Amino acid sequence: KQIFIALCCFILLFVISLAGCGKGNTKNLVIDYGTSSIYTKDDMDEAIDVIKKQFSSFEGCELHSLSYTSDDACNNEDNIAWMNELEEANDNKESFTQCISFDSSFRSPKNGGGAWNANEEYTWSWWMARSEGGTWKLMTWGY
């Protein structure tokens, strides 16, 4: 019985030690906030946190940079309408009044796997939306 308990403890410690392995790495992230007359640094940081949370599921990838696109690219009627169309397509009811976009570069895992080519640099865009005073919701990301 003692051997069984010791073995269970060893397995538990091993699993706990691996819990952080393989997740998307954002430690060396460089952020370019650009210039905005619409969003504060805090607004952008809240959006960046949403991106980082999603990126953490990109096993073995390393996020290198995030760059705010621009006020013109983000907060225009066409893109806000697009965000609302995406929301409706997902059967959700929130009505967005603001959107924000960041371009990114990141490296895929050295050995590739899944949808990733091995050790390749990717450049993706990340689009989020919110209603006035609300929290950012990640709507779409990719090429």
Language model features with spans:
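Short beta-strand edge/turn micro-motifs at domain boundaries
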Residues: 121-143
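Flexible low-complexity loop/turn motifs enriched in small/helix-breaking residues
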Residues: 20-120
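Sec-dependent N-terminal signal peptides of Gram-positive bacterial secreted proteins and lipoproteins
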Residues: 2-23
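Short acidic, gly/pro-rich beta-turn/loop elements at beta-sheet edges
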Residues: 16, 112-114, 138
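Generic hydrophobic secondary-structure signal
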Residues: 5, 18, 55, 100-102, ...
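Residue-level signal for the start and early helices of compact helical domains
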Residues: 7-12, 93, 97, 119, ...
